[in-house]
């Protein structure tokens, strides 16, 4: 199939498969999964009041401004990179890109990148469980940001070797997965319990 047809078709097939999986999971949870006898809804009065009380309590926490700044800025560089990385990989070399096809970029991010991201996240979780956030925060911050330099390398060298480009994306995604663990763990710790 031509790439103009193959890409939309691949997305359609992906979402149809996801829809089937979700319907099967719904049916399993609705009809097959055992339900304990004491599984009854709990009523806490006015649900709207409880909803707003949760927000009020959260924003009264000590250090909320610093925590929100950390949450919003921790992956700031990565959020900027992710918007420009795909166009950089897709654009023609004449205008500064690497000239990859949509299928190549999809494979690099969807297979190589996802595997590296998952491994980085799992490793980050294991190390965080051993030594805690305080020990790993600077290492994970560096892991989140320093691998972005692979795109500087790619921009200067314009390699055509798909393995080199895939390795660079894998390094960046591994660092993102490893570093993102710190942000996730921080949000879990900060949001736990009242004040």
Regions found by a protein language model. Name each.
Residues 134-183, 187:
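C-terminal transmembrane helical hairpin of 12-TM major facilitator-type secondary transporters
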Residues 13-17, 105, 136:
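Alpha-helical transmembrane segments of multi-pass secondary-active solute transporters
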Residues 73-85, 176, 180:
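Conserved extracellular-gate-facing transmembrane-helix segments in secondary transporters
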Residues 118-138:
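Helix-to-loop junctions at the C-terminal end of transmembrane segments
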Residues 11, 98-110, 161, 165:
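Juxtamembrane helix-start elements in MFS-like secondary transporters
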Residues 1-80, 129:
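Intracellular loop-helix junctions on the cytosolic face of multi-pass helical membrane proteins
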Residues 187-195:
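Paired intracellular helix-loop junctions of major facilitator superfamily
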Residues 74, 83-107:
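Short amphipathic helix-loop junctions that connect adjacent transmembrane helices
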């Amino acid at each position: 199939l031509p790439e103009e047809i193959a890409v939309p078709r691949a997305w359609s097939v992906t979402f149809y498969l996801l829809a089937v999986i979700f319907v099967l999971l719904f049916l399993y949870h609705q009809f097959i999964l055992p339900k304990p006898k004491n599984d009854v809804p709990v009523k806490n009065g006015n649900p709207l009041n409880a909803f707003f009380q949760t927000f009020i309590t959260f924003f009264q926490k000590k250090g909320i401004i610093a925590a929100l700044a950390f949450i919003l800025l921790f992956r700031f560089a990565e959020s900027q990179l992710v918007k420009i990385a795909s166009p950089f990989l897709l654009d023609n070399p004449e205008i500064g890109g690497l000239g990859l096809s949509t299928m190549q970029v999809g494979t690099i991010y969807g297979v190589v990148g996802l595997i590296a991201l998952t491994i980085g996240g799992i490793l980050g979780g294991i190390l965080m469980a051993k030594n805690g956030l305080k020990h790993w925060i600077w290492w994970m911050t560096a892991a989140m940001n320093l691998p972005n330099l692979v795109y500087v390398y790619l921009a200067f060298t314009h390699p055509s070797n798909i393995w080199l480009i895939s390795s660079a994306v894998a390094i960046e995604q591994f660092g993102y997965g490893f570093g993102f663990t710190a942000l996730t763990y921080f949000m879990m710790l900060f949001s736990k319990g009242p004040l």
